[in-house]
Amino acid sequence: MAADPKAEEYLIASIRAAMENVRRRTNAPFGAVIARHGTVIATAVNEVDDLCDPTAHAEMQAVRAAARALNSVDLSGCTVYASGYPCPMCLTAMYLSGVEKVYYAYSNEDGAPYGLSAERGYIEIARPLDQREMTLQGLHVRDDGEDLYQAWQGITPASS
């Protein structure tokens, strides 16, 4: 894989955004930059504590901002530059939105001494369902009338 000539520059930008956030607030030290074809589309920081939102990780906030900037949930061709190793939630959001590449500056090992490793989430997801800490159980419940998914399929373009 060819090296991204902007990777170091954008990773430094993500680290600087995270550092500014740390100095201003009490949020975790994470920043993210999203670019498409060499142009920055979004820059975001962790806002979990400020927003009382456990999903407001820097990468999630950047994905949201990029989608709004592009007026599309399709982030194909985009690259994420994250100050830290993405957690499973953020990585999944990037997969679902079509992000092409992800670069990170600080590894899980770098973050572990500070309680900032995402490793626990990856370990938990890799476990069989019956061995996970949190119960995840499907119950085959349906409402009377039209099926939910069939109704959605009937109003959604085939490409969705």
What function would you assign to each model-found segment?
Residues V48, A82, Y106:
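Residues that line or immediately flank small-molecule/substrate-binding pockets and catalytic motifs
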